[in-house]
Amino acid sequence: MLRTLSLVLFTLVSVSALAQGGPPYYTNDPGTPGPFNWEINIGYMPFFYSNQSVSHTPDVDINFGVGERLQLTYENAWLRVQNPGSKTEFGLGQSNPGVKWRFYDGGESGLSVSVFPQFFLNNPNDAVRRGITPPSQSFLLPFEFSKKFGPVDVDYEIGYQAVHKGPDGWITGLVLGHEFTKKFELDMETYLPGTFHPAQFQPTIDFGGRYKIHSPVILLFMAGRALEPTRSNQTYFLGYFGLQFLLPPKSYNRE
């Protein structure tokens, strides 16, 4: 039932979706920091499977605004990987550089659309040999859509992933959110990554929010799980718990 609901939601908003995407969620939105502004997200991200646990301790996501509509991004994480019967491994994850361009901007409540090409690259260390990162490297080409419908912010993302030494895949995600006050918002996300050959996908659902502690610091939190019955490659718990820093502070409105 939950999987059916998530697929229906994707269908309804794929034709319409600056909204609630980005950390702590997997789905991105068309928003950018603005010229010469920084958005830095630092978080703890646990992924618990029936036969393994992987944690980003921490995950660091750095974004820099180049003009009003362009953003440069770099993300990486220090990973903790625990497999039953073996010692815990630590190491650097894949580097994730990217460029986001919001090529259509409908204003605060109108439709906005962006493209966000990204690479996922292994670093020159032994993380692949130790099973910390996958041997495959990839290029992701997603498009993001956002629009406000009354009190609800809608963000939708869909993309194609070309994989070297692995099956090509796709991603799609939806975030629905509402700002209850100027400082506090709550959101729901459904996220669906998959591969073409073999035809597989792993839908997840999560709930989270943001709380503006003090400009320019924002608390980020999210928790969720897989929608399908737990298998060895399905997460029975996933989360994000961290902080967002908007710099320089004078560039953002104080509330």
PLM feature spans:
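Transmembrane beta-barrel domains of Gram-negative outer membranes and organellar outer membranes
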Residues: 19-255
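N-terminal signal peptide c-region/cleavage motif recognized by signal peptidases
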Residues: 14-16
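Positively charged n-region of N-terminal signal peptides that target proteins for export
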Residues: 1-4
